Amino acid sequence: MRNVLAVTILSIPALVGAQQPAVIKLQPHNARLETAFTAITSIRELSDGRILVTDPRDLQLVVADFRTGDVRQISRRGGGPGEYGFAAPVHAIAGDSSLMADFLQRRVLLLDQDKIVATVAADNAVIRATQGFITFADRVGNVVSQKSSDPPEGQSTTSMKDSTAVIRVARRTGRMDTLAMVLVRPTVRTITRNAKGDISFSSARPLRLRVGEQFMLHPDGWLAVIRINPFRVDWRSPDGRWTLGAPLPVPVIRMSEKEKQASLARTARSMAANPSSTPIPPQLRTPDDDWPDVMPPYLQGETLFSPEGHVMIRRQPSADHPGVAYFVVDRRGRLAGMIEMKDNERIFAPGARSIYVVETDADDLRYIRRHPWPHSALPPG
């Protein structure tokens, strides 16, 4: 008898004004690390099943082995060769090679499995083009970043009419191409410059319940662009062909007093779970009347790929749908299903045939689980 699939597709009642999506249910995990993390920013699977994890608050850059439970730090913070100023996300490149942008020192570290083997200096063409801020990398020799206009001095507010360029830079030659334009997240910014014109102070406060368009580069070179109006996913192939997704059948939720109270309650719970030791400065406080006309369909910055290469987008919680859930959109721009998780769980990264989930306990400590995910779980994109 065939083994039970690690992912089972069920049906659920249709959302109001939308088609009936399939629920993709994860089976129990097959591995869990007992080491607690404080703030996980990336998980990168190696071919032997170990993972590289970045935890900039505590453990920094580590390699973890599910079989032995061993978690070992790689290098250390510092300015020397192979050291880093900040444990930024690790990106897979060819084979078991990876890169980590050390943007505080305007350089890039290259890894072979669990060893840092080279440091790319600030005069490299890739560093100059991206200023050290590398958002994604692929296995065919490119990195991706954003290129925005210089912010004006004083206080300004970006709107959904403002955009930024998604740029691709070839690691070998430094050639830069603009792949797409994406709308930025509406944000109030305050900039102060010194006599030389350099930024001496900067603050930013995203407007409440507003999101910008998002993009992701898959290791195979495909670019996913998550559009906001209408909510859809456009795909760009490595050779430049675009597949424009149709509007996703997700209901538009109008802002109401019920939604406002639900949002304020979510914010209060988050602040209680993550108390700040310093008061919030006035320019970063959200005005009481700062509400959009409609709820955004997704949360900013909580996207990832599935093992098949579909894009997974975390749904914006609402009064009627407060739980943690992810839309799964295939490479034709179709809604393939939805994954529902517990309130203390987040889907974090894909592996070759696995999905990695981060669970948070009552002390705000984070633990990594691995769930099997066969490639037959979803239709191909």
Regions found by a protein language model. Give the residues of each.
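Eukaryotic scaffold repeat domains enriched in small/polar residues
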Residues: 17-381
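Positively charged n-region of N-terminal signal peptides that target proteins for export
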Residues: 1-4
